[in-house]
């Protein structure tokens, strides 16, 4: 029996079943980008149409304390404002230190920083992508520092509580762009609060991507964003299965890894798919490998038995 037996079938992805091939030049030769460094800095941009003023310290503390507990502002306000989240202590070699939160001034948003490759993988708001990137000319950058010193589930919840507080502070925010994963999602989708707990991190911070392999019938589904929690991203290289089923499996699998503290080892098996449903009597083997699609990183490759593509040892 595989490690995936208790997960329920999750929400369908907004990614369409028929997707045009992504003809992008691959570059896996570069070193790991800082935004996907395991345990690295969480980075999101709040996108808006008009420039806005930074909230007052009192407004910040009211919203952040409601969501994050004991929060203290420190340092001078300038191009940014900084806070210490005292209920979230990062365990470092020299002892515990509160996680630091930073929120920048509202500044111009350089849309050209998002290349065609990343734009092609914004499945959660594909219908709104172009008008958001053309109309939202301003952004507020928000980050955490030292969050990698928290347990994975605690950091996942903290980051999403932080994000919900930011969207209360910035009601003019139209969309959230996650620099770590390349995911863009409408701010109102988060404001609805239809998802709770650590599920929010999987839905709002992890990007499940889809690629057709030009000249073949092969596809790749992978994730980006799990490395913030010291969890390897997922990769599926396959043919002859509905990609939406695989996207759904990837979201469920990502949630399983987070819920269970990343328990999978090389050679372990997980529940597979039959007619879109996750079933126990089909088992897929897992293996840690190098990513097939940029950025360069280690991934947990899922071998889909007769649907698997490519060469595996």
Regions found by a protein language model. Name each.
Residues 45-48, 52, 147-155, 238-242:
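Conserved aromatic-histidine-acidic binding/catalytic patches
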Residues 181-313:
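Aromatic/basic-lined ligand-recognition segments
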Residues 104-207:
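Internal, hydrophobic cores of structured domains that mediate oligomerization or house catalytic pockets
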Residues 56, 60, 151-162, 242-249:
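Short amphipathic alpha-helical segments
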Residues 40-50, 136-146, 302:
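Short, hydrophobic/proline-enriched secondary-structure or compact coil segments at domain edges
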Residues 2-65:
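N-terminal alpha-helical "arm" segments
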Residues 65-76, 161-176, 256-264:
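Structural alpha-beta junctions
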Residues 52-131:
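N-terminal low-complexity, intrinsically disordered segments
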